[in-house]
Structure formats: C-alpha cells, structure tokens
Regions:
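Glycine-rich beta-strand-centered segment in the early N-terminal region that forms part
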Residues: 29-47, 57-100
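Short, flexible surface segments
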Residues: 35, 90, 146, 237-238
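Short, well-ordered alpha-helical microsegments
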Residues: 88, 160, 184, 205, ...
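Extreme N-terminal starter segment of soluble prokaryotic enzymes
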Residues: 2-5
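Glycine-rich cofactor phosphate-binding loops and adjacent beta1-alpha1 units
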Residues: 191, 195-238
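Mid-domain Rossmann-like dinucleotide-binding core that forms the NAD(H)/NADP(H) cofactor-binding site
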Residues: 125-202
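Short glycine/threonine/proline-enriched tight-turn/helix- or strand-capping micro-motif at secondary-structure
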Residues: 17-29
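NAD(P)H dinucleotide-binding glycine-rich loop of Rossmann-like/cofactor-binding domains
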Residues: 72-79, 87-154
Length: 238
C-alpha cells in the first residue's frame, strides 16, 4: 500500500523555542481520488512566523488554532498528479494552505492555480503569506505617497524586504532596520533601500535622525519592542 509522510502538531508551544517535541511524523495511506477531487504533490512549503500563533491555543485569534493531532498548517505550492475535477488538470500548479504533508487531496476550495511563469520559491514569497501581508499592510493601512519616508523594521525578513521594494518602486525614501551589517548591505545594495539601521550596532535615535531628516511618514512594524518607540519619536503628524 502506497503511503506518504505528514507531520502532526501534538503539543502547544511554551515561551521558549519551538522544538521537535511538539510534532509527530506519521505515515498516511495515499487517498483515492473521487469525482470532483484532485491529488496534489506538494513541492515547496513556506515556514512563516505566523505559524507560532497558529500553534498557540488562542481562540480569539484571526484564525482558529491548529487542532492537536492534525497536520500542521502551512502554505505551499504543488503539482496536480491525478484529477477527476473538471476545472483542475494534471500538471497544473496550485497554491494555498496545504499543511506539512507530501500529498493533499482537494476539491479545489482554498487552492488557487499558479499561472505566473515563476519558480515555486518566488510564488511562496511574493504571492503567499509574506507578499499578502506586505501589500495589505502597506497599501490598506500605510497608504504611502510618493515623496514620503517609510521605516521598515525586520527589513531583511520575508515581509519587510517586500515592503521596502514596493515602497521604493512607489517613490518613497525607504529606511530599513536590521540586526547585522550583512543584512544592512543586502537591503541597501541588493534591494535598493535608501539606508539601513543596525539596531545591534547603532544608536537608534541618532541613526534614525541622520537618515530621516524630514521625519517619518509611514512605519511598517514587524518586530515590536524598543525600536518602535524611537521611530514614533520621529513620526510626522497626520
């Protein structure tokens, strides 16, 4: 009997790091594809910071927590390997919440076809959770305008790096807050940020004053903590 591997969540995380003791590797029987269904072989899976919240028992969150004993939640990209669904054909790529498993049986609900000629890694970063978080936060909440100054914390992360590039393309002055010189070099020289603050090395207040002489119009918060207090002190009135 053909089987595939899945990983279930079996315990809630505490305050410390997430470890393997929270998970269980299981073998599952390959499902039969019924009418109106298709089978997806997952090729790439995204590990996102939001997962910690999904594992936690917070019933008032924007999404219910993962039930213990079930496949851990995650977004992924895969290829349809068998189909009895009129709208989904073998060989097509799909993306959506697939979980920590090699194969997924679906009726199409919650999955979207991938039509862009991009590699799976680009699809998961730009069109999955990081890209959606970046675009919704920047445009629905931040409402940036050309000529303004934006500061992005966690600027070298999956969300922050996209926010910075979008803002730069829209004509903003973009300053990123990062935790190393290597990350600072990357966001400035590779991604096109106008400046970088290494919070582990620089005096935050002094460096922000230097890089934002006209104040800060938009702040995209990814980290929390003392960084935001220094940014707030430089914010322009709206």
């Amino acid at each position: 009997m053909t089987t595939y591997t899945a990983i279930n969540l079996i315990a809630r995380p505490g305050a410390g790091p997430v470890g393997p003791e929270l998970f269980e590797v299981v073998s599952k029987q390959m499902p039969s594809v019924g009418e109106g269904q298709f089978l997806v072989k997952q090729n790439h899976m995204s590990l996102d910071p939001a997962m910690f919240g999904w594992m936690s028992p917070d019933t008032e969150s924007y999404i219910p927590p993962v039930e213990l004993g079930t496949v851990m939640r995650s977004s992924g990209v895969g290829e349809i390997v068998e189909s009895k669904h009129p709208d989904f054909q073998v060989g097509e790529r799909v993306m959506g919440m697939m979980g920590w498993q090699e194969y997924l049986l679906s009726d199409g609900v919650g999955l979207n076809k991938v039509t862009a000629p991009l590699p799976d890694e680009a699809i998961l970063s730009v069109f999955a959770l990081p890209g959606l978080t970046a675009t919704q936060g920047l445009y629905s909440i931040g409402k940036p305008q050309k000529g303004e100054t934006i500061v992005v914390s966690g600027a070298a992360g999956s969300v922050g790096s996209i926010v910075g590039q979008l803002a730069k393309a829209d004509g903003l002055t973009v300053i990123g807050v990062v935790g190393s010189d290597e990350k600072a070099d990357w966001i400035v020289n590779e991604l096109g940020f106008d400046g970088a603050v290494n919070y582990k090395k620089h005096d935050l207040a002094e460096k922000l004053t230097e890089l934002t002489p006209n104040g800060i119009d938009v702040y995209f918060e990814n980290t929390g903590g003392p960084i935001q207090h220094h940014v707030f002190a430089r914010m322009n009135a709206h």
